[in-house]
């Protein structure tokens, strides 16, 4: 895994530990702010590969993208995620990819909490995985306090175009989420779910 490579990017602060533990934390903590800034630099470099403006060819482009992703995300280097630019993320190092991952363009990873993605997962264009949320109390919200809850996407999941996955959700193995759905609650394994909020409509029978 690339965890050792990105370890140096992870803030060594109490606020970071609060953040990934689902506790209220100060979003404008100095080290968290710097980590987001560093992430945006890497994100810009990755997104600038869109269109192969240097004419390096498909094979070299795939290699360069994998090298950039390895600087910020956690994954098995034998199977780098395939992500079409542009994409967006908060930190990057809180996203853990399984093998054979594919995301189409304009995907967003709001990773203030851990996003765990299994093997053979596919995301359509404009998918948003959002672990971040805010207090309902406006006084707490205005003070800069935020919190997040993890997202877990298990093996062999397909998430369709424009889906939004909200904090704390697990999508079970083999499930399919229809385009435009807003996933607010856990989805059982081998289930087709659609709508806003997403609701299971039938089981998927795998041969």
Swiss-Prot record:
InterPro entries: Hexapep (IPR001451), Hexapep_transf_CS (IPR018357), Hexapeptide_acetyltransf (IPR051159), Mac_dom (IPR024688), Trimer_LpxA-like_sf (IPR011004)
SMART domains noted in UniProt: Mac (SM01266)
Alphabetized Gene3D superfamilies for the sequence: Hexapeptide repeat proteins
Keywords, sorted A to Z: Acyltransferase, Repeat, Transferase
Listed PROSITE patterns: HEXAPEP_TRANSFERASES
Example of a GO MF term: O-acyltransferase activity
Enzyme class label: transferase
Cleavable signal peptide: none
Cross-referenced PANTHER family: ACETYLTRANSFERASE C18B11.09C-RELATED, SIALIC ACID SYNTHASE-RELATED
Family the entry assigns: Belongs to the transferase hexapeptide repeat family.
Protein's name according to its UniProt entry: Putative acetyltransferase C18B11.09c
Protein source organism: Schizosaccharomyces pombe (strain 972 / ATCC 24843) (Fission yeast)
């Amino acid at each position: 895994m690339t965890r050792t490579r990105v370890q140096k990017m992870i803030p060594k602060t109490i606020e970071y530990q609060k953040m990934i533990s689902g506790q209220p934390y100060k979003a404008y903590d100095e080290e968290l702010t710097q980590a987001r800034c560093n992430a945006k630099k890497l994100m810009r470099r990755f997104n600038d590969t869109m269109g192969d403006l240097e004419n390096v060819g498909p094979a070299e482009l795939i290699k360069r993208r994998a090298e950039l992703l390895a600087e910020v995300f956690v994954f098995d280097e034998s199977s780098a995620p395939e992500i079409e630019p542009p994409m967006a993320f908060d930190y990057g190092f809180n996203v853990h990819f399984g093998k054979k991952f594919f995301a189409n363009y304009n995907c967003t990873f709001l990773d203030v909490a851990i996003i765990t993605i299994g093997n053979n997962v596919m995301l359509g264009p404009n998918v948003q995985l959002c672990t971040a949320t805010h207090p309902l109390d406006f006084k707490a919200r205005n003070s800069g306090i935020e919190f997040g809850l993890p997202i877990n996407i298990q093996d062999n999941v397909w998430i369709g175009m424009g889906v939004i996955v909200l904090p704390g959700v697990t999508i079970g193995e083999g499930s399919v989420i229809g385009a435009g759905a807003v996933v607010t609650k856990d989805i059982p394994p081998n289930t087709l779910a659609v709508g806003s909020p997403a609701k299971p409509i039938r089981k998927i029978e795998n041969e």
